[in-house]
UniProtKB/Swiss-Prot annotation:
Its main location: membrane. The keyword Cell membrane applies. Keywords: Cell membrane, Membrane, Transmembrane, Transmembrane helix. It is a single-pass membrane protein. Coiled coil: none annotated. This is Uncharacterized protein SA0203. The keyword Membrane applies. It comes from Staphylococcus aureus (strain N315).
Length: 257
C-alpha cells in the first residue's frame, strides 16, 4: 500500500514538474516574441519615407552583393506578379537607384507578360524613369496615357504604407540572429490591415483573398537608422491565380579601404 502511494506521489510530482517546465518554456517563447516585435517596431517606425530624396542623407547597412561601381546607393524595388500553378503570367516591376554621391534617382519600370498557352510567347517592355521633386517622370516619351498615369502615380509601401501595423497581427512568428543581425517575420494578415487594403485597392485584388506576409532584413532591432529589408505579400483566393507583391530597400556603402 505504501509503495502504491509512493508511486502515485512520484507520478504526480513528474506531472507537476512537466507542467511547470512546459509553462516556463511557453512563457519564455512568448516573452521572446514580444521582445522581438518591440525591436521590429523600432525599425518599422522609421517609415514611411514620404520623400525618397531624403535617402540622400541616410546611411544603412553595407550590402556586399552589388558591383563596385554601384556604391553609396540605395536600391528600391517593387513588383506585382500574377502567378499560375507553376509559372509567372504577368509582372510589373519598378526599380530605382538612389545615388547618394550625385543626388540623382534613376531607374526603370518593366512589364512582363507570358502567354499560358504558348510558353515561347513572352512580352517584355522597359521604360526608363527618374525622380524629380519626389515625383516619378519618364526620360522618354510614353504614348499610352493609362500606363503613363499608372507609373507616374506609383508609390512604394515605404512611402505610403503603415508598416508597424503588420505587428498588430496575432498570427506572426519573428526570429532574429544577433550574430548576423538578420531577422525574419512571417504570418497572416487580416483584411483590415491598412497595407492589405492599400494593395488590394491599388491592384484590384479580390477583397476576400487571404493574405500572408513575410519580412526579411538586417538590423540590430534598435531602430537607429533605415535598414536593408525585403517585404512580401501573398494573396490567395480559391480557384484564382496567386498574386505576389514584393518590395525591397537595400543599401551599398562605398568602401573606405
Amino acid at each position: 500500500m505504501k509503495a502504491h502511494k509512493i508511486f502515485w506521489l512520484n507520478l504526480a510530482a513528474i506531472i507537476i514538474i512537466s507542467i511547470v517546465v512546459s509553462g516556463g518554456m511557453f512563457l519564455a517563447m512568448k516573452w521572446e516574441q514580444i521582445h522581438l516585435k518591440d525591436g521590429l517596431k523600432k525599425v518599422l517606425s522609421t517609415y514611411p519615407i514620404k520623400n525618397l530624396e531624403t535617402l540622400y542623407e541616410i546611411d544603412g547597412h553595407d550590402n556586399p552583393h552589388y558591383e563596385n561601381n554601384d556604391q553609396d546607393t540605395w536600391y528600391i524595388e517593387s513588383s506585382y506578379s500574377v502567378v499560375g500553378s507553376d509559372e509567372l503570367l504577368k509582372e510589373d516591376r519598378m526599380l530605382l537607384k538612389v545615388d547618394k554621391n550625385t543626388h540623382k534617382i534613376t531607374g526603370e519600370y518593366d512589364t512582363t507578360t507570358n502567354d499560358r498557352k504558348d510558353a515561347t510567347d513572352s512580352t517584355y517592355k522597359s521604360y526608363p524613369v527618374k525622380v524629380v521633386n519626389n515625383k516619378i517622370v519618364f526620360t522618354k516619351d510614353v504614348k499610352d496615357p493609362a500606363l503613363k498615369q499608372k507609373i507616374e502615380n506609383n508609390q512604394f509601401l515605404i512611402q505610403s504604407g503603415d508598416l508597424t501595423s503588420i505587428l498588430n497581427s496575432n498570427d506572426l512568428k519573428v526570429t532574429h540572429d544577433p550574430t548576423t543581425d538578420y531577422y525574419n517575420l512571417s504570418g497572416k494578415l487580416s483584411n483590415d490591415n491598412p497595407n492589405v487594403k492599400q494593395l488590394k485597392r491599388r491592384y484590384n485584388i479580390p477583397s476576400n483573398a487571404s493574405t500572408k506576409v513575410e519580412l526579411k532584413g538586417m538590423s540590430d532591432l534598435k531602430g537607429n537608422n533605415h535598414q536593408d529589408q525585403k517585404l512580401y505579400f501573398y494573396f490567395s483566393s480559391p480557384g484564382k491565380n496567386q498574386i505576389i507583391y514584393k518590395e525591397s530597400l537595400t543599401y551599398n556603402k562605398l568602401s573606405e579601404h
